[in-house]
Regions:
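Short, conserved micro-motifs composed of acidic
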Residues: 1-177
């Protein structure tokens, strides 16, 4: 999907297909935003469908020019948005966070999913199934090498179940996500 001639990454859609959350490069004054290590920063956006066009493209309020917010995933009830970020409060290089989506379309305060999921390394690319299982990539949990795909059950009380490496053939000695 291209909006404003800028490519979108990792789109996730509401069940009715009328709202899309997606990742974009962080452009600052017409240039790609970068951190002090020259890494391109990312931001999350929301767009709504009007007929056959995507409109009302808005930047999510917890984005920043100082860190990345990327890779959105929706909970089955569409009331929680999961994402990866290196925002303040991150335990490692990047962590999985969640934020509530309020009935009026506003957002709560992003919450780090904690040290059962997040490590001192990278956790990224969350995906939530209809059964409330969270799949994510990590190179901080024991794996086969590089980023591996892991799964855990998201519980109604906000806790998570045990973390399981999904194993081969999904995971390899290379980065898998």
């Amino acid at each position: 999907v291209k909006l404003d001639k800028i490519p979108t990454l990792n789109p996730v859609f509401t069940k009715d297909g009328n709202t899309m959350y997606f990742t974009r490069n962080n452009f600052n004054n017409g240039k790609k935003g970068r951190d002090s290590e020259r890494t391109i920063l990312l931001k999350l956006y929301k767009a709504t469908k009007d007929g056959d066009k995507w409109t009302n493209v808005t930047e999510l309020p917890f984005n920043s020019n100082e860190y990345s917010v990327a890779h959105p995933a929706l909970s089955p009830d569409e009331k929680t948005l999961y994402f990866a970020s290196n925002m303040p409060g991150t335990l490692g290089a990047s962590d999985i966070f969640k934020v509530s989506i309020n009935a009026d379309g506003s957002y709560g305060t992003p919450e780090n999913l904690g040290n059962k999921i997040n490590t001192e390394a990278r956790e990224t690319f969350p995906f939530v199934t209809d059964n409330n299982e969270l799949y994510f990539a990590s190179d901080g949990h024991p794996g086969l090498g590089g980023l591996d795909v892991f799964v855990t059950q998201l519980k109604e009380d906000g806790n998570v179940g045990s973390i399981k490496n999904v194993g081969e053939p999904v995971n390899s000695k290379m980065d898998d996500f």
